[in-house]
Curated annotation (Swiss-Prot):
Matches recorded under PANTHER family: BLR6921 PROTEIN, MAJOR FACILITATOR SUPERFAMILY MULTIDRUG TRANSPORTER MFSC
Cellular compartments annotated: Cell inner membrane
Membrane topology listed for this record: Multi-pass membrane protein
Molecular functions per Gene Ontology: transmembrane transporter activity
Species in which this protein is naturally found: Klebsiella pneumoniae (strain 342)
Protein name (record): Putative multidrug resistance protein MdtD
Length: 471
């Protein structure tokens, strides 16, 4: 990559910083949630909406980001994404109520939704095809470092400054990134087909209303009638999308994707699997601080082994799947993740704190093998004309299921806690015990889906490269 022009290398640095900002923000908030709750005068049971609002917005906006970049230009959209993300960070830091913070996170999510996919498109357009893989490795490396630094950095800032600084640190980086984007990045555009606005609005309405309805009456503060209305609107929107997409060649996501059995199994398993996995990064730091009395910094450090395990497993996951096949790896890793989650809970309640980093490292390894296997299984048999659409749908489902997972985790805490998180330690431990038992059951359920995957031991699991795939 050293033989690339200096201007292209600078453009790759801009994209890399965008990836870093977005990935850092997905984990830096988790450690700060209990401190935020205390500062805002809210129950910790309601703080999951800070994560849900961001991740759900990313899921809703993802389908439009690539089309906007092609239509308006990658520089214009990437600049807009950085500005929105930075402005959202400023508003988050200034928020004095939970509602204000949630709205600011929505603005952040709009920027974050455009930053990563548009960054991938930028690399695709500025780098020669034979150097694309090396360039993508370079720009995605900061995106892998972000989740590693996020929990510890969040803990340091909360413990030695205040939670506001987890958002304020984005502002100078965002300003420099926005200026560099305007000065250095070319504004590539492409001829685009007409955007399926109707399909986009229907899917967005369905995802948003059904996810919010999961939060229930206590989380939203609405009557049963309004809650039923949300569910009805969400279901109607999804049914209308199916009717809209049937036989529609310009649909946002073609229904022909689901004629491929492997794609259908992979997407269904990914959706269900990531609901369970999405609970863990939210619940772990909350349990460590509220249930065990860890400081924010200590809780943040405890999350690092999970990320290290995830990064380490990526190096060998292809060999593992080639050796044992998708079905065995996915079923075993799904049941294993449920078991390790319970092992973490019982080790913590037994006071075996020295074992927790090892358990979290193992949890990260298992989670990484599931994620990689689910992604490749879903896309591996799609024809080239459906690969881009299938990859976009998978990306959207990944974000949606994570937001649902965090919502359900918050719902479980509320169900078992009943606003009594400040009682004696034994009662608090009981709340988290019941929550983790329920989570383990939810994490294990996708094994039923993965058990239907055809046995493919000995076949090559590597996906051939797609021109427009975002994977």
């Amino acid at each position: 990559m050293t033989d690339l022009p200096a201007s292209v290398r600078w453009q790759l640095w801009i994209v890399a910083f965008g990836f870093f900002m977005q990935s850092l923000d997905t984990t830096i908030v988790n450690t700060a949630l209990p401190s935020m709750a205390k500062s805002l005068g809210e129950s910790p049971l309601h703080m999951h909406m800070i994560i849900v609002s961001y991740v759900l917005t990313v899921a809703v906006m993802l389908p439009a980001s690539g089309w906007l970049a092609d239509r308006v230009g990658v520089r214009n959209i990437f600049f807009t994404a950085i500005v929105l993300f930075t402005a959202g960070s400023l508003f988050c830091a200034q928020a004095s109520t939970l509602d204000q913070l949630v709205m600011a996170r929505v603005l952040q999510g709009i920027g974050g939704a455009m930053m990563v996919p548009v960054g991938r498109l930028t690399v695709m357009k500025i780098v020669p095809r034979d150097q694309y893989m090396a360039a993508m490795t370079f720009v995605t490396l900061p995106g892998q470092v972000g989740p590693l630094l996020g929990p510890a950095l969040g803990g340091v800032l909360v413990e030695y400054a205040s939670w506001h600084w987890i958002f304020l640190i984005n502002i100078p980086v965002g300003i420099v990134g926005a200026i560099a984007t305007l000065c250095l990045m070319p504004n590539y555009t492409l001829q685009t087909r007409r955007f399926d606005l109707s399909g986009f609005l229907l899917l967005a309405a369905g995802m948003a209303t059904l996810t919010l309805a999961l939060d229930g009456q206590k989380g939203l503060g609405i009557s049963s009638r309004w809650l039923a209305g949300l569910v009805a609107v969400g279901l109607a929107a999804l049914l209308l999308y199916l009717w809209h997409a049937r036989g529609n060649a310009r649909a946002l996501f073609s229904l022909n994707l689901f004629r491929n059995r492997t794609f259908s199994l992979g997407l269904g398993g990914s959706f269900a699997g990531r609901i369970g996995s999405g609970m863990l990064p939210f619940m772990t730091p909350v349990f460590l601080q509220i249930g065990l009395g860890f400081s924010p910094f200590h809780a943040g450090l405890m999350m690092i082994p999970m990320v290290l395990g995830s990064m380490g497993m990526k190096r060998i996951v292809v060999q593992v799947v080639n050796r044992f096949g998708y079905r065995r790896v996915l079923v075993a890793s799904t049941l294993g993740l449920a078991a390790v989650s319970l092992l973490f809970m019982f080790s913590a309640l037994a006071g075996w704190y020295y074992a927790l980093p090892l358990v979290l490292f193992l949890q990260g390894m298992i989670n990484s093998s599931r994620f990689s296997s689910m992604n490749t299984l879903t896309l591996k048999d799609l024809p080239d004309d459906l690969a881009s659409s299938g990859n976009s749908l998978l990306s959207m489902v990944m974000q949606l299921s994570m937001s649902i997972g965090v919502t359900i985790a918050g719902l479980l805490l509320g169900l078992y806690g009943q606003q009594h998180m400040s009682l004696d330690a034994a009662s608090t431990h009981q709340v988290f015990l019941y929550t983790y038992l329920s989570m383990a059951a939810i994490i294990a359920l996708p094994a039923l889906i993965f058990s239907r995957v055809p046995d493919d031991v000995g076949t090559n699991t590597v996906i051939r490269r797609r021109n427009r795939s975002g994977s």
